[in-house]
Amino acid sequence: LLCVSLVMKREIKMKKSVIRSAVFPVAGLGTRFLPATKASAKEMLPIVDKPLIQYAVEEAYEAGIRHMIFVTGRSKRSIEDHFDKAYELEAALEAKNKQDLLHLVRSVKPDNVDCVYIRQSEPLGLGHAVLCAEKLVGDEPFAIILADDLLDGYPPVLSQMLKVHEEQDGSVLAVEKIDPSRSGSYGVVSGNEVDKGIYRLNGIVEKPKPADAPSNLAVVGRYVLSSKIFDHIRNVKPGAGGEIQLTDAIAALLKEEPVFAYEYDGVRYDCGSKLGYLKASVEFALRHPEVSTEFATYLKSRSLT
């Protein structure tokens, strides 16, 4: 009986640790990239030959997630079109026997991936965007990926986080160390280190002044959260910037269950800024098999002028 009980407890814990869904909040206006984003989603901006949102979905897919939930807004139809089947394009490529390109087009959304779209009616902040996905997520833990934070890691950063989620049995936020002077642009956490690069949180503050920041650990665009976060989002009052902040809901969540911060292994490109976007474009071009050699030569020639 004891053995059966232990097996059942282990199975229950494993079921609780399975992350089936990823939420992609993509309703933002993308004002930093106007006029390019006037009629198209900022998440569709390409890094070489793939849009940011595809990198994000691939990261979720490689972590074993097959249910992709997009919280969209006006002018985001291009995201739906990107992950839809392109019959005319595929037929044209098939007719010209361009099999490599045909494979690329078909691999954008594997057949075993389910993409669902829900509209955020008003731009009320990240917390509100996540709440829009509640009925689609259900009563189970889930991931959140902000596509304009391009995280380049191996294994992929979300895969690293799911391992921490399983080992620590709690919600997980990706964090990185920042210069304290930049704290006003991030959610900043405080906590106790329980393992290398893993912190059990006791506090989180949205965009604190440098003098008020509890640490130099800033949250970046990856989260693995308990479904209880939805109840806390509903109780959040508009915070910094007049929006419903996910950070405030996490601050309430960590008072009732474990929430951890994880210093991920990888490099972050802030593609919500022009400079970060350009850095990502250069770095990914330098490893792209089609253009890397010529592009590196070009960069060297530019450095001499």
Per-segment meaning from a language model:
Residues 89-92, 99-191, 225-227, 234-236:
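Conserved beta-loop-beta/alpha segment of the NTase-like Rossmann-fold superfamily
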Residues 15-95, 156-160:
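N-terminal glycine-rich phosphate-binding loop and ensuing alpha1 helix
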Residues 44, 115-117, 171, 259-261, ...:
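Conserved beta-strand scaffold positions in the cores of enzyme catalytic domains, especially
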